[in-house]
Amino acid sequence: FKAIPPTVLIFNVSYKCDSKCVMCNSWKLPYHDGLTTEEYRRAFGSRLFRRIEYVGITGAEPTLQKEMVELVHIMADHMAGLRKMTLNTNGFVKERVVRTLESIVDVANERGFVFGTRVSLDGVGDAHEDIRRVWHAFERAMDTVRAMRELQKKKFFNFGVSFTFTAQNMEEGDRIYELCKKEDLNVVFSIARYSELAFGNMD
């Protein structure tokens, strides 16, 4: 028997979130800054990560991690075979989100890996707001969608939206599909995951 080095890394960068989703309680979990960038540098310097080809950045809201772009640099430094990186965002604060994502796009294009990012939508209009429990959630997310599509005209990266089926939005899948057809947006559909450790949502 010989252990095979991992090629996929799902990286939860933070439990900090500016949303209060009905299907996720990560915003209630104790937040701490976790590792410092230097500690991350030492961690990713381990041979365990040398053959990573795909990194999926997740969390609560990844763009709230102040060192997010620096962490991408660190991963690129230590993962010579890195081919693709993805990140999902709620898109609520357009200026912060676009600024962070554009910087990651620049790193990806400089280092030669593909970066893909998606704005999460749980429904159209009030349906999205009811699930995220954030004022004007849908309008704010769509503002970010439009800004990222404008950025796509200048820089190379993959972009779209993501929709997660939960008990609260079963009827919204079709509406999101029609919206994405109308707006010519790529969309990925998935089923909600439940984990007490990751999301605190087993209740």
Model-found features: residue ranges?
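Conserved alpha-helical substructure of the radical SAM core
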Residues: 1-115, 196-197
